[in-house]
Amino acid sequence: MSEEQITKKVIEILRAYVKDASLLEKATAETHILKDLKVNSARLVDIIIKCEDVFGATIDDDEADRIATIGDAVTLIQQKAA
């Protein structure tokens, strides 16, 4: 799966947790999930679990702690898929 495909899927997953959908229209790899998209930290756990389900990857707590941006999530998923 390409980086672009993974990014699109991650944004699709985020759509269910972001109250203001217009924020996702401008989202890039540098978009901070908690600050820019205004997702609370409890929801970030739900997002990570959903990513595990969708991508068939296991993300441990240390790895999850390093996810701050959309790009961080995409990079981690790419590493897990390799």
Specify the residue positions occupied by each region the protein language model found:
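Thiotemplate assembly-line natural product biosynthesis machinery
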Residues: 1-23
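Charged interaction scaffolds used for protein-protein
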Residues: 16, 81-82
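Phosphopantetheine carrier-protein modules
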Residues: 18-38, 55-66
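Two-component histidine kinase catalytic core, primarily the HATPase_c
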Residues: 43
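C-terminal structural segments of small proteins and small subunits
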Residues: 65-66, 71-77
